[in-house]
């Protein structure tokens, strides 16, 4: 089992290397949308890990987009950690006039409070447009956003149903088939 010590990579992003599958998506996104590369894959083989160069913090204007492209949750939003479960929040498409990015986002709300802000994703769950850190981390007030409407999800999505009360038609356990 691979275990890693926690590493602080910035004021807004938490890295959990124990979850990382070394897909390099965060490294590629940071390299493509920013001018300076401050993190990458360190060491070789079984000792490989994602880290910043000489323990510098990742502080560029679009660094939060690495959270959206991480497929396993190894990079998480420090401003949203342990606030609530994702399936308790309702996603809404929203936008704002931002001089740095497009401002088109999905805001995740619990009641009237914005819990987190993410980039909009298409039907393949890929980020449509990257958003700046100002939109993602700094603007958590409802007055900062123009709400366009609720976000559409697949009919069987836990987030769309927002509960676990739907009864199953039939439950079959075929233990003899697996013995």
Predicted region positions:
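N-terminal export/assembly segments and adjacent metallocofactor-ligating motifs
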Residues: 1-179
């Amino acid at each position: 089992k691979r275990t890693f010590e926690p590493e602080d990579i910035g004021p807004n992003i938490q890295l959990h290397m124990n979850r990382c599958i070394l897909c390099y998506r965060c490294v590629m996104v940071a390299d493509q949308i920013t001018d300076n590369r401050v993190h990458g894959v360190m060491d070789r083989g079984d000792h490989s890990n994602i880290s910043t160069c000489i323990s510098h913090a990742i502080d560029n204007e679009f660094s939060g987009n690495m959270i959206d492209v991480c497929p396993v949750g190894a990079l998480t939003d420090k401003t949203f950690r342990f606030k609530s479960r994702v399936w308790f929040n309702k996603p809404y498409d929203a936008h704002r006039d931002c001089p740095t990015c497009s401002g088109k986002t999905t805001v995740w709300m619990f009641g009237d409070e914005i819990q987190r802000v993410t980039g909009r994703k298409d039907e393949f769950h890929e980020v449509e447009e990257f958003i700046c850190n100002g939109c993602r981390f700094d603007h958590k007030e409802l007055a900062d956003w123009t709400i366009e409407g609720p976000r559409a999800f697949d009919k069987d999505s836990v987030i769309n149903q927002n509960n676990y009360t739907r009864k199953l038609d039939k439950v079959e356990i075929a233990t003899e088939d697996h013995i």
